[in-house]
């Protein structure tokens, strides 16, 4: 059962005007079981609004959630990303010119509610958006040709505790180098990087041409653990020789906060 909510954005910065963000509750997956695996409650949120067009990262902060039996619901631990920012994901069906092209989705995961619970009575918190246009320091640009193969030197990355190395196109990384990963050779239509980000400060990484236009991709693969990983991005076409990487880093000035207050979310 789907319920609809609309909330309004109060800008976190004085120079940022308020913007409307529509939040729709999508699919709800409720797996109440006594087992340790595949259990839990997953709530899909769909977001749309003008502020999202410039956003490069998103995360949710849940202050409290209570079901209709009065029990507090505990947010499930994200073993892969922790509480850091994530890249925005298009809603299924979006990106191909249909009505969902400007709609994004995210998921909230909670531990099992009681079997008697029929709804989430209240869910309070916030959605935080990384909007790089609010702070030039939030965007770091590097040349693949000039900077690949060595740790990127940058004050913002250093302050965030991030180590970042662009992979050399077509070159195979030495096993054990940098962050303990063995990297296989990149294909002629692939670009990649190696990152250690213990605080979850890097929201996303894009590869672009020299003019800043994002290179279209078919997806990515990654390996790693403990906030360190090796990533390969498969591009639709062979990347240009002057390709650049744009690294989007969370800074205090770049974050816009959307208050979140949802009520009476029916459970399946």
Language-model features, listed with the residues they occupy:
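Sec-dependent signal peptide recognition
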Residues: 2-10
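N-terminal signal peptide c-region/cleavage motif recognized by signal peptidases
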Residues: 14-16
């Amino acid at each position: 059962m789907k319920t609809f909510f609309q909330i309004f954005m109060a800008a976190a910065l004085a120079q940022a005007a308020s913007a409307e963000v529509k939040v729709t509750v999508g699919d709800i997956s409720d797996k109440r079981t006594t087992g340790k695996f595949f259990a839990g409650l997953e709530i899909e949120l769909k977001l749309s609004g003008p502020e999202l067009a410039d956003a490069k990262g998103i995360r949710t902060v849940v202050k409290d959630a209570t079901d209709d039996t009065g029990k507090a619901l505990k947010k499930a631990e994200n073993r892969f990303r922790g509480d850091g920012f994530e890249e925005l994901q298009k809603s299924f069906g979006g990106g191909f010119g249909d009505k969902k092209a400007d709609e994004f989705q995210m998921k909230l995961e909670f531990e099992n509610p009681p079997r008697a619970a029929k709804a989430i009575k209240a869910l309070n918190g916030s959605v935080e958006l990384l909007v790089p246009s609010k702070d030039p320091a939030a965007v770091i640009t590097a040349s693949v040709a000039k900077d690949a193969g060595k740790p990127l030197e940058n004050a913002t990355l250093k302050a965030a505790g991030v180590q970042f190395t662009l992979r050399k196109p077509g070159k195979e990384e030495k096993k054990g180098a940098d962050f303990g990963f063995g990297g296989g050779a990149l294909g002629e239509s692939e670009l990649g990087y190696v990152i250690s980000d213990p605080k979850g400060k890097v929201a996303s990484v894009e590869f672009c041409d020299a003019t800043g236009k994002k290179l279209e991709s078919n997806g990515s693969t990654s390996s790693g653990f403990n906030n360190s990983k090796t990533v390969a991005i498969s591009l639709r076409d062979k990347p240009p020789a002057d390709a650049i990487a744009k690294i989007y880093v969370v800074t205090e000035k770049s974050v816009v906060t959307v208050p979140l207050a949802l009520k009476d979310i029916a459970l399946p």
